[in-house]
């Protein structure tokens, strides 16, 4: 009895479990024309009454300590895109920054309240505001273009 029940259930349910091939008039079933142009960026402005805490200024911080803090903050942004871009950027350039360049980089990554803004500016999806359009931002944009075609699939080792 149990054997008959299982055989009937298998016969009825097996066709439902097997994958079916979809037939399409397009080769490979893909229409790549819809992916050739990037979609428009949907970006919402922050509400007026939204309190954004000011980042504390550290005027007496030694340069070596500041660079260590910026290295950590560049690796731990909260969004993978910026983690990869900024961590590879600081691995390549931060050690050669002087005090002024380090301060500009500090202002760039800590003065902006939205990480997506940094990403859009660096990828040149949105125009960079004048207060952040510095030599450091130009260097970051050049780094993001990746003219050397370096693979950036993970953060560099510490």
Curated annotation (Swiss-Prot):
Transit peptide extent on chain: 1-23
Keyword field contains Transit peptide: yes
UniProt main location, coarse: mitochondrion
Pfam families in the cross-refs: Sdh5 (PF03937)
Protein location: Mitochondrion matrix
Claim: Mitochondrion is one of the keywords in the record: yes
Membership in a protein family: Belongs to the SDHAF2 family.
Protein's job: Plays an essential role in the assembly of succinate dehydrogenase (SDH), an enzyme complex (also referred to as respiratory complex II) that is a component of both the tricarboxylic acid (TCA) cycle and the mitochondrial electron transport chain, and which couples the oxidation of succinate to fumarate with the reduction of ubiquinone (coenzyme Q) to ubiquinol. Required for flavinylation (covalent attachment of FAD) of the flavoprotein subunit of the SDH catalytic dimer.
Name of the protein in question: Succinate dehydrogenase assembly factor 2, mitochondrial
